[in-house]
């Protein structure tokens, strides 16, 4: 099961709603994944289509409990290439679909023409809990969240630009920074930062999934920190090795051209130690001197040796 499906299944296990909260959930689900159909004799029907059976069962329960609508769940094969099962909840004229659509703020009637409303009515999101439940419904109807092992991305797919903007504004009342982009014929409200994805999961009540994501975030951060440390250590080691090789080349050049005995005693001591201990750090070389010398002192002497070697190279010796 994908992480997105796990989140939706977790959220659907909660079904203790007040009627106002149930209206908010249904309103958002129906706008995200519902279709209005005109039947014969000026009758209408409404279908909610989902690939997640838990969502279909939740809709069935809410309709039965709060609206006394006894509908059915039909299962059929999707028209997509994957041929997944899809679940269809149909609400007909005889079941009271018109009253339901008005109650949840999905339908509007202009000049006798019945159309879907893409506003988010204030009476549907009148308090904090109903706002959270609306966002939950929008996620169940058209949302998805990426596998946090790979990336942090949560989105809501809508089919109307104004509705996408309204949903974005509602989400952002919780201090989030969701944005809208157009993707082919859809308008997508999305969040990309890990911390904000966590916040939104908290808003919709997906607490177990939230903890799973947080654990993944912690592990990923630890891995990144370890990788940074390893890269830093590797870079430092490479730098030390390159410096040691360069210093040894300079010392051998001096030894060949004029002999180490021509060097001042303090430089000669460091030169011999570097030849004998090519892998040691400057700090360790300094400890071997008598009296001991600090890292900067050893570095200063080796720089003098390299300068002498450079002069010999210029002279062509």
UniProtKB/Swiss-Prot annotation:
This is Probable cell division protein WhiA. Disulfide bonds: none annotated. SUPFAM superfamilies: Homing endonucleases (SSF55608). GO terms for biological process: cell division; regulation of sporulation. The keyword NADP does not apply. GO terms for molecular function: DNA binding; endonuclease activity. Belongs to the WhiA family. The keyword Cell division applies. InterPro entries: Homing_endonucl, Intein_endonuc_central, Sporu_reg_WhiA_N_dom, Sporulation_regulator_WhiA, Sporulation_regulator_WhiA_C, WhiA_LAGLIDADG_dom. Involved in cell division and chromosome segregation. Residues 281-314 bind DNA. It comes from Clostridium acetobutylicum (strain ATCC 824 / DSM 792 / JCM 1419 / IAM 19013 / LMG 5710 / NBRC 13948 / NRRL B-527 / VKM B-1787 / 2291 / W). It comes from the Bacteria. Keywords: Cell cycle, Cell division, DNA-binding.
């Amino acid at each position: 099961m994908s992480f997105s499906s796990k989140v939706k299944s977790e959220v659907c296990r909660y079904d203790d709603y007040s009627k106002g909260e149930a209206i908010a959930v249904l309103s958002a689900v129906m706008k995200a994944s519902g279709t209005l159909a005109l039947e014969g004799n000026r009758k209408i029907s409404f279908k909610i289509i989902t690939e997640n059976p838990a969502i279909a069962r939740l809709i069935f329960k809410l309709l039965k409990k709060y609206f006394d609508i006894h509908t059915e769940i039909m299962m059929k094969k999707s028209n997509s290439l994957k041929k997944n099962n899809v679940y269809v909840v149909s609400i007909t004229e005889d079941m009271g679909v018109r009253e339901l659509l008005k109650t949840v703020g999905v339908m509007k009637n202009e000049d006798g023409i019945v159309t879907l409303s893409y506003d988010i009515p204030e009476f549907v999101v009148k308090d904090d809990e109903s706002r959270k439940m609306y966002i939950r419904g929008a996620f169940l109807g058209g949302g998805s969240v990426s596998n946090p092992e790979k990336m942090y991305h949560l989105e809501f797919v809508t089919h109307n630009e104004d509705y996408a903007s309204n949903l974005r504004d509602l989400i952002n009342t919780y201090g989030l920074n969701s944005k809208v982009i157009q993707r082919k014929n859809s308008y997508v409200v999305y969040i990309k930062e890990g911390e904000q994805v966590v916040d939104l999961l908290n808003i919709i009540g997906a607490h177990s999934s939230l903890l799973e994501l947080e654990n993944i975030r912690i592990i990923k951060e630890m891995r990144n920190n370890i990788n940074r440390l390893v890269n830093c250590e590797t870079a430092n080691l490479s730098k030390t090795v390159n410096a040691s090789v360069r210093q040894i080349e300079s010392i051998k050049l001096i030894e060949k051209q004029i002999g180490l005995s021509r060097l001042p005693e303090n430089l000669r001591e460091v030169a011999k130690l570097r030849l004998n201990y090519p892998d040691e750090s400057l700090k360790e070389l300094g400890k071997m001197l008598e009296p001991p010398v600090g890292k900067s002192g050893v570095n200063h002497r080796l720089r003098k040796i390299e300068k002498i070697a450079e002069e010999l190279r210029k002279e062509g010796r």
